[in-house]
Regions:
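Boundary at the C-terminal end of the N-terminal hydrophobic targeting segment
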Residues: 16-21, 27
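Conserved active-site-adjacent core of cysteine acyl-enzyme catalytic domains
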Residues: 93, 103, 281-413
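Extracellular carbohydrate recognition and processing domains
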Residues: 145-195
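Noncatalytic regulatory segments and standalone regulatory/sensor domains
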Residues: 31-35, 45-58, 62-89, 107-110, ...
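Bacterial N-terminal signal peptides
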Residues: 5-17
Length: 414
């Protein structure tokens, strides 16, 4: 996985590692991934090419979106209106409820066919935010309309919002959410297309209900992971000594939870294991309730898992892996990965299931042969669930199917 740092000049993103990462899957093209993380003032500003309304940049935030009624703060509003947006002709009124931010264009070095978006945000009571994406094929092409990715909080913004020519506000509508356009779509929690795109933007819209003054939705981190198919060869891999270990991730079983949902909560169970490893004891059912996606009636929404983990105290992001060396680096640094797999019958020896259309488990380390140590929540006991899977088989059921992972980090120090 290539890490791209989002600097102040976002139109030319700097490579933080030297090559595309690839995975091997006999007879098929391999995946290559790039990761862009915005988590500081410079990356959100993007050489003044971002747009915002009722928003402020702060070193500790780094992005603060005012929601609900506000006491007048003309200096902060002026800074965004004049320096960043440069085209607003009026100041916000004190009784407006909503705010928004549009990122600079974020370019993929090799183009992309799929894209994961994830976020860490703080929402006060009676507030919420939604995230949207739009993409374009090249600088000569127009952007697509905004596609709805997901939301968080108790007050959800309107389903759609269109920016008028003067740019001073958004015209919103509560009609159906737009999730597909021009041969591309948001498939529950990720963007996918048969076409290749060159750049993306995200938009976050925040709002609130009630009359409490001076509330803000704080955006701490936004991550985008671009993915494309490639013919490039897979890197060789020998597990380094520091990755030959089993991280002390406390095992949990989804099977011991409430019978009505036990078969559906592999994602929150795996998140709870990762949180426990980070020193945050969260009940599995509490994690499931927090992460549950009522719009799709699933517990396995990837974006909600990342934000849910953050709401319990652990920041993180969605990433994709296609290079075992990158996986080993995370293990060596003490970071387990919650990974998303799909396996046909006979594809994963020793698993506590014959096949799965979709399942999540925790990757905890490597053994001396380079095979992979995991905590699989589909087992009922630690003895049955702390397993070693063959690396070639896990590559087939994980990396060749996208390599999606939750990267859950240590709690943020205040």
């Amino acid at each position: 996985m290539t890490l791209l740092a989002a600097h102040a000049v976002v139109t030319v993103l700097a490579l933080a590692s030297v090559a595309w990462a690839t995975n091997s899957s006999q007879g098929a093209k391999r995946w290559a991934h790039e990761l862009v993380v915005l988590d500081d003032v410079d990356s959100f500003l993007g050489a003044a090419s971002s747009l915002a309304y009722r928003a402020q940049l702060e070193l500790g935030a780094p992005l603060r979106l005012s929601v609900g009624p506000q006491e007048p703060d003309p200096h902060a509003d002026w800074w965004w209106r004049e320096r960043v947006a440069g085209r607003f002709d009026r100041a916000p009124t004190s009784d407006e409820l909503s705010s928004w931010y549009v990122s600079p264009p974020l370019r993929s070095a090799g183009g992309f066919e799929q894209l994961l978006l994830s976020w860490n945000i703080d929402c006060p009571p009676e507030s919420g935010a939604c995230f949207e994406l739009r993409v374009r094929e090249s600088d000569e092409h127009d952007w697509t309309p905004w596609l709805y990715v997901g939301d968080w909080g108790s007050a959800v913004p309107a389903a759609t919002a269109v920016e008028p020519e003067d740019g001073s506000h958004l015209v919103t509508s509560d009609g159906p959410k737009l999730v597909a356009v021009d041969g591309a779509r948001v498939d529950i929690d990720f963007f996918t297309s048969e076409r290749t795109w060159s750049a993306a933007q995200f938009r976050v819209r925040a709002t609130a209900s009630g009359d409490q003054l001076n509330r803000s939705v704080i955006v701490r981190r936004v991550a985008l992971c671009f993915s494309r198919r490639t013919d490039e060869p897979a890197p060789s891999f020998v597990p380094p000594a520091e990755a030959i270990r089993r991280l002390d991730v406390p095992f949990r079983s989804q099977k011991t939870e409430r019978s009505g949902i036990a078969g559906r909560i592999c994602s929150p169970t795996s998140v709870a294991m990762a949180l426990g490893y980070r020193g945050l004891e969260v009940d599995t059912l509490a994690a499931a309730e927090r992460i549950f996606d009522s719009a799709h009636d699933i517990y396995g929404n990837w974006t909600r898992a990342i934000q849910g983990a953050y709401s319990f105290g652990a920041p993180g992001y969605l990433a994709r892996f296609s290079d075992w060396n990158e996986v080993a680096r995370h293990i060596a640094e003490g970071t387990p990965l919650v990974i998303s797999i799909a396996a046909k019958e006979g594809e994963l020896d020793g698993a506590p299931y014959a096949k799965t259309a979709g399942h999540l488990l925790v990757l905890c380390g490597f053994d001396e042969k380079g095979d992979v140590r995991v905590n699989d929540p589909a087992a009922s006991t630690p003895q049955a669930g702390q397993l070693v899977y063959r690396r070639d088989q896990l590559e087939r059921v994980w990396m060749a199917r996208g390599g999606t992972s939750y990267v859950i980090l240590a709690p943020r120090k205040h």
